[in-house]
Regions:
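Phosphate-binding loop of NTP-binding sites
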Residues: 1-119, 127-134, 138
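Adenine nucleotide phosphate-binding catalytic loops in nucleotide-utilizing enzymes
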Residues: 116-178
Length: 178
């Protein structure tokens, strides 16, 4: 957001964490006009609210960082959450979608939008099973267990399927140092 503020002067955000429809509405209603005439918003939006919000605003960019099982009590299985997000994105087919390429969930999403990927591009080792819980995420093509040349967290990293050859997509944006 800091870089965008340097360019645009003012960026509308929801820093209080109010990320459902009422919080997003309040964020817009209480916003001050931009002095530069350029308007930009960077909003964190609840997965289940995203589709409804897209009925009212048309984002030019979606950034999807991850989906973990921390919301199972609210939304059920991880793939339910993933499909809610895809349904919302489909409402804005001209918006670019920036996905975490390190997540096997985001491999070849069934959306009409232009897609770009970001991720870690650190030193890789030989492909091996992840050291800890990958949340049951399997190869998106053949449902085999994935191996990782680089495993950054849970199911995130430079994954590869030794059964069918599926692997992390080429990254458009890379983090090369920590």
């Amino acid at each position: 957001v800091g870089i965008l503020k340097e360019i645009y002067g003012q960026v509308l955000t929801n820093p209080s964490g109010a990320n459902m429809i009422t919080g997003i509405t309040t964020t817009f209603l209480t916003a001050k006009s931009s002095k530069t005439g350029k308007n930009i918003a960077v909003l964190e939006i609840d997965e289940a609210s995203l589709s409804h919000i897209c009925d009212y605003i048309q984002p030019s960019l979606f950034v999807i960082t991850n989906i973990f099982r921390d919301q199972m009590d609210r939304y059920g299985e991880i793939y339910t959450t993933y499909n809610m997000i895809l349904d919302a994105i489909r409402k804005v087919p001209t918006a670019t979608v920036l996905l975490n390429g390190d997540s096997p969930l985001f491999y070849k999403p069934a959306i009409p939008n232009p897609v770009q990927y970001f991720g870690f591009d650190l030193e890789k080792g030989p492909a091996k099973l992840a050291h800890y819980d990958t949340e049951g995420i399997l190869c998106p093509d053949c449902q085999s267990i994935l191996k990782y040349e680089l495993n950054t967290y849970a199911n995130l990293g430079a994954y590869i399927c030794e059964n069918c050859g599926c692997k992390r997509p080429d990254l458009d944006y890379r983090l090369t140092e920590l």
